[in-house]
Amino acid sequence: MPKLAVVLLVLLILPLSYFDAGGQAVQGDWRGNRLARDLQRGGRDDESECIINTRDSPWGRCCRTRMCGSMCCPRNGCTCVYHWRRGHGCSCPG
């Protein structure tokens, strides 16, 4: 096969990896896929308790919202917030 034909074939196939089956661009970050699926299902905000895997840590609150993606805060009573230029984090009382 001539080199030009191989180059054209590669250029044709290469962009296909950037799109999923629905024709939408695939997110590049590791948390984007789950968040994108949740948003496509109706954008339900879901908060449930979870255990943080650090020593002497109390219960935390898992947060899956449009704003926070999927994360856990260090203790009860915390809420997920977005800090401008710092990304997602927790806002805890006290």
Swiss-Prot record:
Residues 1-25 form the signal peptide. It comes from the Eukaryota. Expressed by the venom duct. This is Alpha-conotoxin-like Vt20.1. Disulfide bonds join C63-C72, C68-C80, C73-C90, C78-C92. The cysteine framework is XX (C-CC-C-CC-C-C-C-C). Displays a mini-granulin fold, a structure composed of two short, stacked beta-hairpins connected by two parallel disulfide bonds. This newly described fold is derived from the same cysteine connectivity as knottins (ICK fold). The name 'mini-granulin fold' comes from the structural homology with the N-terminal region of the human granulin. One of its GO terms (molecular function) is ion channel regulator activity. One of its GO terms (cellular component) is extracellular region. The keyword tRNA processing does not apply. The lineage of its organism: Eukaryota, Metazoa, Spiralia, Lophotrochozoa, Mollusca. Hetero-, homo- or pseudo-homodimer (identical sequence, different post-translational modifications). Its main location: secreted. Belongs to the conotoxin D superfamily. The modification 4-carboxyglutamate is found at E47, E49. It comes from Conus planorbis (Planorbis cone). Keywords: Acetylcholine receptor inhibiting toxin, Disulfide bond, Gamma-carboxyglutamic acid, Ion channel impairing toxin, Neurotoxin, Postsynaptic neurotoxin, Secreted, Signal, Toxin.
